[in-house]
Amino acid sequence: MAKKIIGYIKLQIPAGKANPSPPVGPALGQRGLNIMEFCKAFNAATQGMEPGLPIPVVITAFADKSFTFVMKTPPASILLKKAAGLQKGSSNPLTNKVGKLTRAQLEEIAKTKEPDLTAADLDAAVRTIAGSARSMGLDVEGVV
């Protein structure tokens, strides 16, 4: 028989930097999960990633106080800012453009994000990422 699920916890944690302090500790503690066990498992799973890159994670908590977790890909906005070399997006994206991205850069980001996107193919994924880039005040070359 399958374990009884008591809840899901969604967090964004920097790669390799999970520790028992907030937000991880309180979120797991109120469900009675072993905080240090999660931190060690998460840090081991993100060892090969760029340190500090925010990784969305969905933790499934079970009634017997065990858990599983699924890591998602980093947010598109973080990847776009990194590709454009920016600290933050535009405060007024319609009039104030803060950077420029090529189609090749968008394709690379789309390939990274592909497992989490619902796009049918790479071209649709590129258009989705291009829309996110435009809403951040980035000019997009080669995408209609």
UniProtKB/Swiss-Prot annotation:
CC annotations in GO: cytosolic large ribosomal subunit
InterPro entries: Ribosomal_uL11 (IPR000911), Ribosomal_uL11_bac-typ (IPR006519), Ribosomal_uL11_C (IPR020783), Ribosomal_uL11_C_sf (IPR036769), Ribosomal_uL11_CS (IPR020785), Ribosomal_uL11_N (IPR020784), Ribosomal_uL11_N_sf (IPR036796)
Top-level taxon of the source organism: Bacteria
Keyword Coiled coil: no
SMART domains in the record: RL11
Gene Ontology MF terms: large ribosomal subunit rRNA binding; structural constituent of ribosome
Nucleus among keywords: no
Posttranslational modification: One or more lysine residues are methylated.
Record key words, sorted: Methylation, Ribonucleoprotein, Ribosomal protein, RNA-binding, rRNA-binding
GO biological process per UniProt: translation
PANTHER family, alphabetized: 60S RIBOSOMAL PROTEIN L12, LARGE RIBOSOMAL SUBUNIT PROTEIN UL11M
Subunit architecture: Part of the ribosomal stalk of the 50S ribosomal subunit. Interacts with L10 and the large rRNA to form the base of the stalk. L10 forms an elongated spine to which L12 dimers bind in a sequential fashion forming a multimeric L10(L12)X complex.
Protein family per UniProt: Belongs to the universal ribosomal protein uL11 family.
Role, per record: Forms part of the ribosomal stalk which helps the ribosome interact with GTP-bound translation factors.
This protein's name: Large ribosomal subunit protein uL11
Record gene name: rplK
